Amino acid sequence: LRHSSAASDVYKRQAKNDDKFEIGRSITVRAGSDICLISTGTLLPTVMEAASKLALQGITVRVESFHTIKPLDEEKLSDVFSRYSVVAVIEELSRISGLGGNVAEWLSRQDRMKVRLFLCGTDDEFMHEVGTQHYARAKYGLTAENIAHKVLDAHSKRAR
């Protein structure tokens, strides 16, 4: 359950159809074979939009929803990092100590994974400004357009 001051931001995630919601197990919300995007929380729709923008450019994107950050779904991470040369973790938290930091720490303990990990989140600082969530996301580059651009750039560099 997430609650914020905006009435539209109150929701409860319930399993649909045969989805099995399990603490510590991510959910694959989109299949793809070129890049994997990992995200969490209310940013997931933006990440799905970025995946659609990449699909228009011929890049198929898998999207994983890590609805729980701890315990980390290490089994899913092993699968993802063995299949993709570019993996991006996108979150509304600091790139340090959030989901991306946990994934980076997990990756550092693995043997010889040849993958490009890209972290997209906020700077490790307080935002000393007043604004909407939309404003804050734009400030930190957490828009569908910017995410798609950064991920495409990382994918292009990896292909060289």
Regions found by a protein language model. Give the residues of each.
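Single conserved hydrophobic/aromatic residue that forms the stacking wall/gate
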Residues: 1-7, 11
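Thiamine diphosphate
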Residues: 9-160
